[in-house]
């Protein structure tokens, strides 16, 4: 066993002595040591219940004849961090999580790992670590939150609350109505109830094969979560016995399938960023062109909030992720069904008995929302290395208009609230990329303000930052190269005409190459917004969004 490094041989007497101080007995040294990587954090609703969750996982691991050791990671609640400097720490926290898990697991030579994530950056951070460490691993997330209901009976979620702010600001609802939405938008523990980033990543974790069937859709408060925990411990023991590791599971084909599900469900645009980072950790050469190819061959079968009023509980009721995959498998060339997963079985075996139970929630191949995926990669002279739009969350497929430029999210939000943005405008929020932000903050507050004011179909928003999975409308993010790297978005001037063509996958500014070259020569890189601490270091090391915004190792040659 891998853990023999710290528990076998006469020279490991000091190590065993320390381990006995934690409560271990001599007989425990013949059992696999299992890292329980938890993320219990009281300020995050999606993680508040994970303390008890972790206890159940440890019981299941002991029952399977193994020895559990629990530790915690950090986490950031993107909703609470939204709209202020806290959002700059969100994406960088992914790297800290990956590094911290790597540190604990490799320092103590565990034989296997069960990861308990749930919310936005915690799930991909742990997945990155699992691929980096490469020991047998199973993921069991904390599960989605249920949707809420206002006193009037309206179904609401977190995106409803954000959009309610814009609606109140523009006089469309009263303060009492906003308070009613606030009080009911997040009714329980769990990851926010729509197809936002957390649920998107937990669904992708399931199809990748790192998590068990049901992981993405079973609610946090559903007793079936406890059954998943028991299964996870049993399956982990099998993975250890068969030496099946994350890099055996997360192949190029598995990532294709993850993006296929993403396209079928119209997941968060953040999935592109995180899954590209996973590919980097797995040592795979996977780029945005391949994502685009998946998007072109996969139909859009589900519209989940914010694209509709359906939520994760509805997906679960309609058959869950397995039912979506089973329907997708009917189309040749969409899925790779014979690859291994954390169940010890193939994807084909995992979904064999699944079926759609509600075809209003999960559409059939014969009745898709669209013939192509709910996420699309755009390119053009404004995004030479690519940009991402959640095409399933807008009915507008082509938009052209003059740009209104803001050099930060705060500046943009103030401008929107002051009425500086009108129907037909293309809002540009720049210098908010991985390096420029730093941290590539999400733009949920500006998009929600625009939607809440009734301009969601009449104003486009482009940024080198990110969008929350709760964002909708004509929102194009991850523009690469970013402004801080001298990308074309940095060269735009007020009133330039910008064209977004979703069907043709184009993102262009109607300015000649000669004029852009002239502007590039005159452009001066702004001073970094942050020069000290973690964000200062992050800004110096982070790479572009089109490569997952991972950190690069400095070249000291």
Swiss-Prot record:
Where, by residue number, does [2Fe-2S] cluster bind?
Answer: 119, 192
Q: Which residues carry this modification: N6-carboxylysine?
A: 121
Protein's GO biological process: isoleucine biosynthetic process; L-valine biosynthetic process
Any one GO molecular-function label of the UniProt entry: magnesium ion binding
Chain positions recorded as Mg(2+) binding sites: 78, 120-121, 442
So what EC number does this one have?
4.2.1.9
Biological pathway: Amino-acid biosynthesis; L-isoleucine biosynthesis; L-isoleucine from 2-oxobutanoate: step 3/4; Amino-acid biosynthesis; L-valine biosynthesis; L-valine from pyruvate: step 3/4
Looking at the Swiss-Prot or TrEMBL record, what is one Pfam family this protein matches?
A: ILV_EDD_C
Q: Where is the active site?
A: 468
Q: Which GO terms describe its cellular component?
A: cytosol
The UniProt record lists the keyword Iron: yes
Which cofactors does this gene product need?
[2Fe-2S] cluster; Mg(2+)
Task: Give UniProt keywords alphabetically.
Answer: 2Fe-2S, Amino-acid biosynthesis, Branched-chain amino acid biosynthesis, Iron, Iron-sulfur, Lyase, Magnesium, Metal-binding
Reaction(s) catalysed by this chain's protein: (2R)-2,3-dihydroxy-3-methylbutanoate = 3-methyl-2-oxobutanoate + H2O; (2R,3R)-2,3-dihydroxy-3-methylpentanoate = (S)-3-methyl-2-oxopentanoate + H2O
Q: How is the cofactor bound?
A: Binds 1 [2Fe-2S] cluster per subunit. This cluster acts as a Lewis acid cofactor.
Self-association and partners = Homodimer.
Function noted in UniProt: Functions in the biosynthesis of branched-chain amino acids. Catalyzes the dehydration of (2R,3R)-2,3-dihydroxy-3-methylpentanoate (2,3-dihydroxy-3-methylvalerate) into 2-oxo-3-methylpentanoate (2-oxo-3-methylvalerate) and of (2R)-2,3-dihydroxy-3-methylbutanoate (2,3-dihydroxyisovalerate) into 2-oxo-3-methylbutanoate (2-oxoisovalerate), the penultimate precursor to L-isoleucine and L-valine, respectively.
Identify its protein family: Belongs to the IlvD/Edd family.
Its recorded name reads Dihydroxy-acid dehydratase
What is this organism's lineage? Answer: Bacteria, Bacillati, Bacillota, Bacilli, Bacillales
């Amino acid at each position: 066993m891998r853990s023999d490094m710290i528990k076998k041989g006469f020279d490991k007497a000091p190590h065993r002595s320390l381990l006995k101080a934690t409560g271990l007995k001599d007989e425990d040294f013949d059992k696999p040591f299992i890292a329980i990587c938890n993320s219990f954090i009281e300020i995050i609703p999606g993680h508040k219940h994970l303390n008890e969750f972790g206890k159940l996982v440890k019981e299941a691991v002991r029952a399977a004849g193994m020895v559990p050791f629990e530790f915690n990671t950090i986490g950031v609640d993107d909703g609470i961090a939204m709209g202020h400097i806290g959002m700059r720490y969100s994406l960088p926290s992914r790297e800290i999580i990956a590094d911290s898990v790597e540190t604990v697991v490799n320092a103590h030579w565990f034989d296997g790992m069960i990861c308990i994530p749930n919310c936005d950056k915690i799930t991909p951070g742990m997945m990155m670590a699992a691929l980096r460490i490469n020991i047998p691993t199973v993921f069991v997330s904390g599960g989605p939150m249920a949707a809420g209901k206002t006193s009037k009976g309206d179904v609401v979620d977190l995106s409803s609350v954000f959009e309610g702010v814009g609606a109140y600001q523009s006089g469309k609802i009263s303060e009492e109505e906003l308070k009613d939405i606030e009080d009911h938008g997040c009714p329980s523990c769990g990851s926010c109830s729509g197809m936002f980033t957390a649920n998107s990543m937990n669904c992708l974790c399931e199809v990748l094969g790192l998590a068990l069937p049901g992981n993405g859709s079973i609610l946090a408060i559903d007793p079936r979560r406890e059954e998943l925990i028991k299964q996870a411990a049993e399956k982990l023991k099998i993975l250890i016995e068969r030496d099946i590791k994350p890099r055996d599971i997360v192949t190029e084909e598995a990532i294709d399938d993850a993006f296929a599900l993403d396209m079928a469900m119209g997941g968060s645009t953040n999935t592109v960023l995180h899954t590209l980072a996973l590919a980097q950790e797995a040592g795979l050469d996977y780029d945005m062109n391949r994502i685009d190819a998946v998007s072109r061959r996969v139909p859009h079968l589900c519209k989940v909030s914010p694209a509709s009023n359906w939520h994760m509980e509805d997906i679960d009721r309609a058959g869950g992720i397995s039912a979506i995959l089973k329907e997708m498998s009917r189309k040749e060339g969409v899925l790779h069904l014979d690859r291994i997963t954390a169940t010890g079985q193939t994807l084909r075996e995992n979904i064999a008995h699944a079926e759609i139970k509600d075809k209003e929630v999960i559409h059939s191949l014969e009745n898709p929302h669209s013939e192509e995926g709910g996420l699309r990669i755009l390119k053009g002279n404004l995004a030479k290395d690519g940009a991402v739009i959640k095409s399933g969350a807008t009915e507008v497929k082509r938009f052209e208009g003059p740009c209104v430029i803001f050099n930060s999210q705060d500046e943009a939000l103030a401008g929107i609230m002051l009425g500086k943005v009108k129907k037909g405008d293309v809002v540009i929020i720049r210098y908010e990329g991985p390096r420029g932000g730093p941290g590539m903050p999400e733009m949920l507050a500006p998009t929600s303000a625009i939607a809440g004011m009734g301009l969601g179909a009449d104003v486009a928003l482009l940024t080198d930052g990110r969008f929350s999975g709760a964002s909708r409308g004509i929102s194009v993010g991850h523009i690469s190269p970013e402004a801080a790297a001298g990308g074309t978005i940095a060269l735009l001037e007020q009133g330039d005409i910008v064209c977004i063509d979703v069907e043709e996958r184009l993102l262009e500014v109607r300015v000649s190459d000669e004029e852009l070259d002239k502007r590039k020569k005159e452009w001066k890189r702004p001073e970094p917004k942050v020069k000290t601490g973690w964000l200062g270091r992050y800004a110096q090391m982070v790479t572009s969004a089109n490569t997952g915004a991972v950190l690069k190792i400095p070249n000291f040659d």
